[in-house]
């Protein structure tokens, strides 16, 4: 019985392995406790850490020679991973050359970091040192891609998100931007229709179709037809479900002269219960979506700080410039943006590790966890 990537096995798989190999002990596992990164999927690190206790007659062979990396990279990796508690001692080495030294740069803000990476990539490509496709930017969470996407678009650097979607194409971002568009002028029927049932208000497809018919017959926008729902005889009592949505939008509009875009976003999130629903889900995906929402608020704050007279319309225009550009070059020569989890097993000539901050890389939850 052979098991690969043993550090990623879960408790149920371990029990199955014990049952299958219990009698004859004809078991060979290959794994590396230093590469255990899938706890959120149920992986149990103790399966590999306690292997010799479960199978005391096992022969352990350390595979410490590395064929991919340079010695400088391995020295840095060895120095970092040596701080892990309870790991199986090992030190990687290679017969490859020492290679370039790892460059360390510290920045005041995430924007400065993304700006540096964009300029450095452009410089190296112009000098013929690398192609765009040789470069990768790695980060801890998908929410961190936003700053790099915006800087790359501004600098005309082709890029591709691997293992995810572009920041402004993510569901929660499109939902909140649709709210902002509706509050701004409500002329965008697609935006209004997107959020009419976000969160769920129990307004059925038939009702929405009849509202659209009324709008078409009377030359109205979809939102203005919603405002007149009580006059649409064909929808009956469903108008009572529409009223709270219209009142919410009108209430937000009345606050526009007095609050900033970031404050408006927070009001929308609070009034709709958007984040509360995600918190109740209590999943890894929900956590990522909440991080994306925080990043959108950060984008709004950055916009407000950079403009003398920030407005909701101005913010939406700035976002549209970024969101509407398809930045993947058909030549396939593009910079790759991805999380560390997506990057496992891949290699690139030029790699940028972004956001290496306390509480972010590794995550705050990982630092505080007992195991």
Task: For each feature predicted by the language model, list its residue ranges.
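Structural preference for long, well-ordered alpha-helical segments in enzyme cores
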Residues: 1-5, 9, 13-16, 20, ...
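Accessory N-terminal region flanking or inserted into the helicase ATPase core
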Residues: 1-2, 11-16, 29, 39, ...
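Conserved helicase NTPase motor core
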Residues: 1-50, 65-69, 268
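Short glycine-/polar-rich loops that comprise or flank the Walker A/P-loop
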Residues: 23-26, 32-34, 55-60, 98-102, ...
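A short beta-strand-to-loop transition that corresponds to the Sensor-1 phosphate-sensing loop
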Residues: 31-34, 41-45, 65-67, 77-78, ...
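Short alpha-helix plus adjacent loop in nuclease-associated cores
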Residues: 34-41, 68-69, 161-184, 196
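Helicase P-loop NTPase motor core
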Residues: 56-59, 64-158, 181-185, 239, ...
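Conserved helicase C-terminal RecA-like lobe
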Residues: 145-157, 170, 177-371
């Amino acid at each position: 019985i052979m098991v690969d990537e043993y550090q990623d096995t879960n408790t149920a798989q371990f029990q199955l392995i014990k049952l299958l190999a219990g009698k004859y002990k004809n078991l060979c596992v290959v794994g590396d406790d230093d590469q255990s990164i899938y706890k959120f999927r149920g992986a149990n690190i103790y399966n590999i850490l306690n292997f010799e206790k479960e199978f005391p007659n096992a022969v352990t062979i350390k595979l410490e020679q590395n064929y991919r990396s340079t010695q400088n990279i391995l020295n840095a990796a060895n120095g970092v991973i040596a701080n892990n508690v309870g790991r199986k001692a090992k030190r990687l080495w290679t017969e490859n050359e020492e290679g370039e030294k790892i460059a360390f740069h510290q920045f005041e803000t995430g924007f400065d970091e993304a700006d540096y990476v964009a300029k450095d990539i452009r410089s190296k490509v112009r000098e013929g040192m690398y192609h765009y496709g040789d470069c990768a930017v790695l980060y801890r969470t998908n929410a961190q891609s936003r700053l790099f996407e915006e800087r790359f678009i501004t600098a005309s650097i082709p890029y591709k998100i691997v293992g995810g979607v572009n920041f402004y194409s993510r569901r929660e971002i499109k939902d909140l931007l649709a709210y902002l568009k509706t509050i701004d002028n409500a002329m965008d029927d697609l935006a209004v229709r997107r959020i009419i049932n976000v969160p769920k208000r129990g307004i059925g497809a038939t009702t929405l179709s009849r509202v659209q018919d009324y709008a078409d017959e009377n030359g109205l926008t979809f939102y203005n037809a919603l405002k007149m729902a009580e006059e649409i005889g064909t929808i009956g009592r469903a108008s009572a479900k529409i009223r709270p949505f219209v009142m919410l939008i009108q209430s937000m509009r009345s606050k526009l002269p007095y609050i900033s875009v970031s404050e408006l976003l927070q009001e929308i999130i609070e009034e709709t219960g958007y984040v509360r629903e995600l918190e109740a889900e209590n999943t890894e995906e929900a956590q990522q979506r909440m991080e994306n929402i925080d990043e959108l608020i950060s984008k709004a704050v950055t916009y407000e700080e950079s403009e003398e007279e920030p407005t909701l319309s101005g913010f939406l225009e700035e976002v549209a410039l970024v969101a509407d550009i398809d930045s993947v070059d058909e030549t396939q020569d593009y910079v790759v943006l991805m999380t560390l989890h997506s990057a496992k097993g891949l290699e690139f000539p030029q790699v940028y590790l972004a956001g290496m901050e306390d509480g972010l890389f590794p995550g705050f939850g990982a630092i505080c966890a007992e195991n």
